[in-house]
């Protein structure tokens, strides 16, 4: 967003955004996320290779639960519907929470995933690599950075 430009956002939202943006811990966390991009891409590729058609997310969910535990989340569980969740306690005493979410399933059937390829421009190709596997890998990177930076 261009500084000083009114994009129609709620003034309270803009104020909150500016405060978050100015926090040194947030800046450090964002730098960590950028620096760890190769690791995030590796996780994205790994998760994309675990086929998870809707209603059959067990294997991908089990691996994601492991990754959340490794990242330091507490209370990592899988609910009866196959959703995986965990908690990362913040360091502030604001009483506020942040939700970071994504979904495990893809629209692809078993057998559709043959591998991950990369084109000449560096784009990854694989059924489900972006929907929503990219978000799962990115969320994990953000959670790791938050944990390391004490956010």
Give residue ranges: language-model regions.
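N-terminal hydrophobic or amphipathic helices/low-complexity stretches enriched
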Residues: 1-49
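Charged, low-complexity surface patches
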Residues: 36, 57, 135
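Acidic active-site catalytic centers that drive phospho-/nucleotidyl reactions
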Residues: 42-43, 57, 105, 131
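A non-catalytic alpha/beta surface segment that caps or lines the substrate-entry region
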Residues: 43-46, 52-94, 115-118
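Active-site metal-coordination/substrate-binding segment of hydrolases
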Residues: 94-151
